[in-house]
Swiss-Prot record:
Its EC number is 1.3.7.7. This is Light-independent protochlorophyllide reductase iron-sulfur ATP-binding protein. One of its GO terms (molecular function) is oxidoreductase activity, acting on iron-sulfur proteins as donors. HAMAP family: ChlL_BchL. InterPro entries: NifH/chlL_CS, NifH/frxC, P-loop_NTPase, Protochlorophyllide_ATP-bd. Its cofactor is [4Fe-4S] cluster. Keywords: 4Fe-4S, ATP-binding, Chlorophyll biosynthesis, Iron, Iron-sulfur, Magnesium, Metal-binding, Nucleotide-binding, Oxidoreductase, Photosynthesis. Homodimer. Protochlorophyllide reductase is composed of three subunits; ChlL, ChlN and ChlB. Component of the dark-operative protochlorophyllide reductase (DPOR) that uses Mg-ATP and reduced ferredoxin to reduce ring D of protochlorophyllide (Pchlide) to form chlorophyllide a (Chlide). This reaction is light-independent. The L component serves as a unique electron donor to the NB-component of the complex, and binds Mg-ATP. It catalyses: chlorophyllide a + oxidized 2[4Fe-4S]-[ferredoxin] + 2 ADP + 2 phosphate = protochlorophyllide a + reduced 2[4Fe-4S]-[ferredoxin] + 2 ATP + 2 H2O.
Length: 288
């Protein structure tokens, strides 16, 4: 099974991806997480350091694939999760999609691509160009990380459009949304009413999720010394269980940009009597 995780930049994709990878490993699966971001920090909370990238290794070996061994590019992370960082081209040059393709090519050359029960691609940012949509070509499911804010859901809608486009020629489905660190889900609910899709989980506003990223540890590792965090791990285990159940998923029909802008704006500008706009939501609106 191959999964891709997308979402607005800074929404918590890598933290979410690492914890889902560990949750899948806890369920007995052999997992490989591939970071698809030039920052090459996707697997930081699994390994505790920035591992060398595949593109750097290829350059060192002058692109002689036969001179590269699995241990040169695959690093063992927490919970037995194997980790790879694709890396990226120099800033302002090259194509990230090419780097993803080279990563998959090398892993296949090493007979590693098909050795795992689950491969999870953690993909940068919210601008899904043809290059960084490349992981969708290899994926069975896409998961979109969001929060209860305008910008994150607007980005989710654009990613849903990419899933729909790729599903024309690939066996790709959208597994659903994952709400990350949000105290409410009313705007998420409003969005999925307009664009029907599953909501796999909504994680509450838990500060330890953010802290885990800074510490370079997953919530599962932190829970070993602080059992009170086990309830947070259960959110990720629930997501893993849903994915392992092989959900039908959906081919989404995204909302036109202007329609979605009007829908989400109206939610803020004309709140229902039961909805009182919070200071955080007012700030979100000011940033639009």
């Amino acid at each position: 099974m191959k999964l891709s995780v997308y979402g607005k930049g800074g929404i918590g994709k890598s933290t979410t991806s690492c914890n889902i990878s560990v949750a899948l490993a806890k369920r007995g699966k052999k997992v490989l997480q591939i970071g698809c971001d030039p920052k090459h920090d996707s697997t930081f909370t699994l390994t505790g350091f920035l591992i060398p990238t595949i593109i750097d290794t290829l350059q060192e070996k002058d692109y002689h694939y036969e001179d590269i061994w699995p241990e040169d590019v695959i690093y063992k992370g927490y919970g037995g999760v194997d980790c790879v960082e694709a890396g990226g081209p120099p800033a302002g040059a090259g194509c990230g999609g090419y780097v993803v393709g080279e990563t998959v090519k090398l892993l296949k050359e090493l007979n590693a691509f098909d050795e795992y029960d689950v491969i999870l691609f953690d993909v940068l940012g919210d601008v899904v160009c043809g290059g960084f949509a490349a992981p969708l070509n290899y994926s069975d499911y896409c998961m979109i990380v969001t929060d209860n804010g305008f910008d994150a859901l607007f980005a989710a809608n654009r990613i849903a459009a990419s899933v729909r486009e790729k599903a024309r020629t690939h066996t790709l489905r959208l597994a659903g949304l994952i709400g990350n660190r949000t105290s409410k889900r009313d705007l998420i609910n409003k969005y999925v009413e307009a664009v029907p899709m599953p909501v796999l989980e909504v994680l509450p506003l838990i500060e330890d999720i953010r802290v885990s990223r800074v510490k370079g540890k997953t919530l599962f590792e932190m829970a070993e010394t602080d059992p009170s965090l086990q309830y947070v791990c259960n959110y990720y285990l629930n997501i893993a269980d849903q994915i392992l159940a092989l959900p039908e998923g959906v081919v989404p029909s995204e909302s036109p940009d202007r329609d979605l802008f009007a829908l989400l704006s109206d939610f803020y500008l004309n709140p229902s009597k039961s909805h009182v706009m919070s200071e955080d939501e007012e700030l979100d609106l000011m940033m639009v």
